[in-house]
Amino acid sequence: MSKPSDHIKRPMNAFMVWSRGQRRKMAQENPKMHNSEISKRLGAEWKLLSEAEKRPYIDEAKRLRAQHMKEHPDYKYRPRRKPKNLLKKDRYVFPLPYLGDTDPLKAAGLPVGASDGLLSAPEKARAFLPPASAPYSLLDPAQFSSSAIQKMGEVPHTLATSALPYASTLGYQNGAFGSLSCPSQHTHTHPSPTNPGYVVPCNCTAWSASTLQPPVAYILFPGMTKTGIDPYSSAHATAM
């Protein structure tokens, strides 16, 4: 890289005058020594010199400075340092703070690859879910079997709508779920006739074990009537 012809060098100071001969001598004695290492050693040796030893070099530096001022009266020292790249300094204008791992599996301290095993085994993944308030999903029609409805009737009447995960989103009111079967209120729910996936409350009397009887099949032979078999028919005939 060629230097500009109008560039004016600075006048040497006392250390530069002294080190000019010392640098050449040290480079000849240590040809493999780097220039930066030579400068460090020369600086340490210059500090060890006394004022009497430095005086000749200080006087020589003053003479060179006076001569430099005569030759270049308008000289002003302007360092040719390259400006620092502001883009490198402010590369990230809006630094983002570290928020930690957002993966709940990593936060739980699971080893790498454990998430794949949990996806393939739903039973293992279910252990990390919070316990649900409702034992059955309100969106699965297959859950509404006779045993499921019977278990839903055993839910205490203190169950609030906020305890059910889908009650607010499906539009259920407190009264709908607050009227689940309770021994003191004698109310229960029935599956919806139009949509099996929903249950509707009713205020009819509670079912008892005596009233829940299976249907009876009747076989009538020639010459026989249903009067002697059906108690309701006999009672109706007596009233007539």
Swiss-Prot record:
A GO cellular-component term linked to this record: nucleus
Gene: Sox14
Protein's recorded name: Transcription factor SOX-14
GO terms under biological process: entrainment of circadian clock; negative regulation of DNA-templated transcription; negative regulation of transcription by RNA polymerase II; regulation of neuron migration; visual perception
Subcellular compartments: Nucleus
Pfam family, one: HMG_box
Organism for this UniProt entry: Mus musculus (Mouse)
Taxonomic classification: Eukaryota, Metazoa, Chordata, Craniata, Vertebrata
Tissue specificity: Highly expressed in developing brain and spinal cord.
Molecular function GO labels: chromatin binding; DNA-binding transcription factor activity, RNA polymerase II-specific; sequence-specific DNA binding; sequence-specific double-stranded DNA binding
